[in-house]
């Protein structure tokens, strides 16, 4: 139960961090390009990689705390960091077809389903 509560709190903090940082960046650089989201996503990748790398090579972080940080905070901050981490795993193990299907499939299917959802939602 404690892990679930910590996961929820970390998720709330990640959401607030995403909202705050994306808004700050977008106000600093107004325009049609979603720079706030772009910055959040790439910084999320950096942070996810850093935490994973530190846990892998430097410190022994309790598995529950790793879940709270990576799934809770980073999952709410950006799911793009998880997507790129899993993509890199496929690339590093030479699973190029799986990587292409995973990365390309999410982008293309995601865009198609977003378009379908928008169209359906506009009809309701």
From Swiss-Prot:
Would I find Transmembrane among this entry's keywords?
Answer: yes
Record's bilayer topology term: Multi-pass membrane protein
Compartments where found: Cell inner membrane
> Could you give a single Gene Ontology term from the biological process aspect?
cellular detoxification of fluoride
- So what does this one do? Fluoride-specific ion channel. Important for reducing fluoride concentration in the cell, thus reducing its toxicity.
Q: Say where the protein is mainly found.
A: membrane
Q: Name one Pfam family in it.
A: CRCB
Q: Protein name, please? A: Fluoride-specific ion channel FluC
Which family does the record claim for this protein? Belongs to the fluoride channel Fluc/FEX (TC 1.A.43) family.
The UniProt keyword set, sorted, is:
Cell inner membrane, Cell membrane, Ion channel, Ion transport, Membrane, Metal-binding, Sodium, Transmembrane, Transmembrane helix, Transport
* Any one GO molecular function term: fluoride channel activity
Q: What GO terms fall under cellular component here?
A: plasma membrane
Cross-referenced InterPro entries, in alphabetical order? Answer: FluC
Q: Transmembrane residues, as ranges?
A: 4-24, 35-55, 67-87, 96-116
Question: What influences the activity of this protein, per its activity regulation comment?
Answer: Na(+) is not transported, but it plays an essential structural role and its presence is essential for fluoride channel function.
PANTHER family in UniProt: FLUORIDE EXPORT PROTEIN 1-RELATED (PTHR28259), FLUORIDE-SPECIFIC ION CHANNEL FLUC (PTHR28259:SF18)
* Binding residues for Na(+): 75, 78
Q: Could you name the domain of life of the organism this protein comes from?
A: Bacteria
Describe the reaction catalysed, as an equation.
Answer: fluoride(in) = fluoride(out)
């Amino acid at each position: 139960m404690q892990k679930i509560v910590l996961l929820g709190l970390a998720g709330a903090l990640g959401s607030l961090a995403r909202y705050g940082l994306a808004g700050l960046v977008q106000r600093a650089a107004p325009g049609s390009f979603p720079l706030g989201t772009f910055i959040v996503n790439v910084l999320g990748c950096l942070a996810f990689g850093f935490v994973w790398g530190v846990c892998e090579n430097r410190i022994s972080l309790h598995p529950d705390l790793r879940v709270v940080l990576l799934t809770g905070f980073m999952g709410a901050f950006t799911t793009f960091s998880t997507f790129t981490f899993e993509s890199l795993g496929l690339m590093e193990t030479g699973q190029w077809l799986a990587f292409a299907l995973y990365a390309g499939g999410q982008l293309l299917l995601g865009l198609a389903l977003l378009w379908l959802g928008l169209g359906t939602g506009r009809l309701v």
